[in-house]
Amino acid sequence: MESKFEFAKELVKKAGQYILDHMQEDLQVETKTSPTDLVTRLDKEVQELLVSEILSRYPEDKICAEEGCLRASVQEGKVWVIDPIDGTNNFVAQQEDFAVMMAYFENGQGQFGLIYDVVKGDCYHGGGAFPVCLNDKPLAPFKAKPLGDFLIAGNSGMLETNEWGLADLSRAVLGVRVYGSAAISFAKILSGRLLTYVTYLQPWDYAAASILGESLGYRVVTLSGETPDFQTRQPVMMVPLEMQEEIQSYIYERKRT
C-alpha cells in the first residue's frame, strides 16, 4: 500500500502541473446539466491523464470518475475515485480555489485520500494507515469549542431557502462561507478553519475527504445522519463526531421552507 500511496501523491501533483501548464490556453468551456455546471477541456484531459496513469500501473483496478461513464462501485474490489478539477467554476472565473481529488478504496474500505490545491501547491494526503498531512506537516485532530466560535461552509441556495435548516444553523455559528469548491471547503475543515460543510455532492466530491477526515475525528454523513451511498448525488455534510449530534439538531430532517 505504501508504494500505491506514494504513486498517488506523485500523480496528483503531475495532474496539477498539467493544469498550470495549460490553464492560459483556450479552455473550451461547455455546460453539462445547467448554465452553472461547467466542464472544460482540461477537466477531460486531466481525468484522461489520471485514469491512464492508474490503469497502466494497476490494470486490474477500477475507476469512478466525474467525467464520462466510469462509475465503479467502491464496495467491490480496488477502486479509485477521481475528481479531475473540483471547483471548475472557480477555475474558469478566477483560476484559483480549485483542486484535484483522488481517493482509493478496497472492498468499501477507504485506504487513503488526496486533495491537491493546485495554485497554492497544498496537498492534503493520508488516511487509513497513513497520517493525515498538509504537505509534510501532520494535521491535528479536531478540537471542540463552543458552536458559536466556529465558521461553517455551505451551499448558497440552501442557505437562502433554509433548506435542511442551513440558515438556522448559520445563525447559531460565527458565520458562513461559500467557497464554490468541495475540495477547498473540506481542506479548511481538515486544517481546523471550518466546523462543517453542508451541501449536495456526488461521490467524487466527498470520497477523499471521507477518508482523510476519519483519521482526524470527522465523518461524512448524509443530512439525515446516514453513511452516503457513494453512488448518487446526496445532501451531505462533513462533521466532527463529537459535535455531530449538536449540529444535526439544527438540520436533521429539516426540509426546504
PLM features per residue range, with description:
Residues 74-130:
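DPxDG-like acidic metal-binding loop motif
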Residues 142-257:
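An extended, acidic
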Residues 1-85:
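N-terminal subdomain of lithium-sensitive/metallo-dependent phosphomonoesterases centered on the IMPase/IPPase/PAP
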Residues 19, 43, 54, 88, ...:
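Residue-level signal for inorganic ion chemistry
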Residues 44, 67, 84-87, 118, ...:
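Generic detector of well-ordered alpha-helical packing
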